Amino acid sequence: EFLFARTMIGVFKNIEYMCNRTSSKTWGKEAWKKIVVCIVSDGRAKINTRTRAVLAGLGVYQDGIAKQQVNGKDVTAHIYEYTTQVGLELKGTQVSLKPRSATPVQLLFCLKEKNQKKINSHRWFFQAFGRVLDPNICVLIDAGTKPGKDSIYQLWKAFDLEPMCGGACGEIKVMLDHGKKLYNPLIAT
């Protein structure tokens, strides 16, 4: 759950950054209405119970209502949505909820019934949500990756400045505790 929380904290900070760009023609105070954070989890039996608790705390998951079958037909996925004003805080690996007075965040959570691996989750994202949301750009972030405070904005900007751009990627840096250095070059890469 702390890896998921680390990613979500970074995403929340990026949304706040875009909302604070008050002189922007695209972004600004209401920017959060243009952003939907889609979370896809691969398999109901596989999801970490503490991660489920974090999602419930954010308001985008309800425990106990998902069923394997409805009217005799197998369920493929469970979809939850919520606009949250709850934030997350990390102290070491301890995740806690905290009220956020500023920027709401629109969340869409897809809990796949079966574990069908990462590529299938990407397919779900593009084929199911992409068709409905019709986004200008999509940013895929693995749980545990912490985006910098403006990195999602910088990716958006790359697409905005070059409409023929079909893909972009950001830089990933190793997260180290303060005062720690990597002396082994194999680990550093």
Curated annotation (Swiss-Prot):
Domain of life: Eukaryota
Keyword Disulfide bond: no
Localization, UniProt: Cell membrane
A cellular component annotation (GO) from this entry: cell septum
Catalyzed chemical reaction(s): [(1->4)-N-acetyl-beta-D-glucosaminyl](n) + UDP-N-acetyl-alpha-D-glucosamine = [(1->4)-N-acetyl-beta-D-glucosaminyl](n+1) + UDP + H(+)
Swiss-Prot/TrEMBL keywords: Cell membrane, Cell wall biogenesis/degradation, Glycosyltransferase, Membrane, Transferase, Transmembrane
An example Gene Ontology biological process: chitin biosynthetic process
Family statement: Belongs to the chitin synthase family.
Protein name (record): Chitin synthase 1
